[in-house]
Amino acid sequence: EDGKVLLGGEGVGNYILPGGDPVEFPELPAVDAKVTFTIKAEDIRRMVSKTIFAVSNDEMRPVLTGILIQVRSEEMRMVATDGHRLSKIIHRTIGYSGEPIDVIVPMKALNLVMRNLQDDDEPEIALAESRASFTTKSQRLVTRLIDGHYPRYESVIPEANPGRMNLRTSDLMSAVRRVSI
């Protein structure tokens, strides 16, 4: 009441914080989704963590400051590059069978989503031409997409690799530790 919010905790005490009238806050924009699907929190966390390191900080090339999300029949790909590093990860079985779509989601928006995901969440992701939304049981984040064409990364990834090596992970990790000292 009167623009204040009362917060209480178990045995901690009560706190009154200044707040605003909820009616004064703008409505979240509608996302006229071309693609809607759900994915487990652990899967989207894994995908973002495997690609976000390659996102560029160079504001002169805005398309590289986000992660390319490609939705295809039954799979979602995330791709990031800064011009020197490239990361691509594919998650199959997202339960989507519509038209393919490519969008570039800002890194800041994905960081917010990752920070607020609970382990048991299964966010619904809705992708449109200019916006994306990430909705869980308790929250909804809507972001503008980065406008532009992502570089054709497929040409730098070899189709076939004639060389192949099999080794135990423990042996590789041991060798890396010895070299890094």
Q: What are the residue ranges of the model-derived segments?
A:
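Structural preference for solvent-exposed beta-strand-turn elements
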Residues: 1-181
